[in-house]
Amino acid sequence: MQEKQVVNQKEQYDLNKLQKRLRRNVGQAIADFNMIEEGDRVMVCLSGGKDSYTMLDILQNLQKSAPINFTLIAVNLDQKQPGFPEDILPAYLDKQGVEYKIVEENTYGIVKEIIPEGKTTCSLCSRLRRGILYRTATELGATKIALGHHRDDILQTLFLNMFYGGKLKGMPPKLMSDDGKHVVIRPLAYCREKDIERFAIAREYPIIPCNLCGSQPNLQRQVIKDMLRDWDKQYPGRIETMFSAMQNVVPSHLNDHKLFDFKNITHNSEIVDGGDLAFDREELPLQPVSWQPEDAEDGDTQPLVRLDVLEIK
């Protein structure tokens, strides 16, 4: 009995530590990108997966101690997929005391009618879903739309665009929607997927599987995801350093003439960003700049992604 109590205490300690890290990461992202402002009504898009559950949980937690006032409303889109468990989310949200709205739209039927059998439905489904969510945000008077993409999603998108699209382009933490009417935010932008996975298991969220539609998986994204996971195992800190690189861009040392005016460099020009280091051996740290041991206490080291003071505590 005593041994069980010790185990439970250890589990609770680990959960508290994990929640603290996620709170800090979300708070940093909100502060860095001014995601949530005084009086905002944030529409939290809830799919029933681990990411959106965690996002709602952490935002609720931050709401209690934030120096600003904002409200949350969870929104789920019931796309009428066969086998979709309609009772799970309402039961969970009622228990949590969260304001919510379930939007019912038969996008599944539309997609199945248009897309041939065996073809990937994700692109059309995503466009339909996006339009419905934008419309719902307007109806609810939401000033921000929160999506549950995390740090790993952002890095995967960066590599997808580099490998398959020929672009140095990731997934922005904050953007204007393509209809020009809504501000979309990603509060989990600094959160690691493995932290979210552990948190979701500990919280015992009622996860709804995302394969109900029967669509083929995005094989390109899965290849990138597997590659990054392998790197994370073999080279600790590499993922953190790559994410830091996305926040430390040096346009004068890339090749995009739209970002930097190469044409007007002359003999009289000033040295920019250290000049040409191509012939010099660049000094690099032995460990990745953002690396820290997996079991390090929060606050033991300061990752490079943040240097200033957190605004939401």
From Swiss-Prot:
Which organism's genome codes for this protein?
Answer: Yersinia enterocolitica serotype O:8 / biotype 1B (strain NCTC 13174 / 8081)
> Any coiled-coil ranges, and where?
none
Lineage: superkingdom: Bacteria
Cellular location(s): Cytoplasm
MF terms in GO:
4 iron, 4 sulfur cluster binding; ATP binding; magnesium ion binding; sulfurtransferase activity; tRNA binding
Query: What residues bind [4Fe-4S] cluster, as annotated?
Result: C122, C125, C213
- Chief subcellular location equals cytoplasm
Q: What is this protein called?
A: tRNA-cytidine(32) 2-sulfurtransferase
How many and how are cofactors bound here?
Binds 1 [4Fe-4S] cluster per subunit. The cluster is chelated by three Cys residues, the fourth Fe has a free coordination site that may bind a sulfur atom transferred from the persulfide of IscS.
The encoding gene? ttcA
> Assembly and interactions?
Homodimer.
Membrane-spanning intervals of the chain: none
* Co-factor requirement: Mg(2+); [4Fe-4S] cluster
Q: What is known about what this protein does?
A: Catalyzes the ATP-dependent 2-thiolation of cytidine in position 32 of tRNA, to form 2-thiocytidine (s(2)C32). The sulfur atoms are provided by the cysteine/cysteine desulfurase (IscS) system.
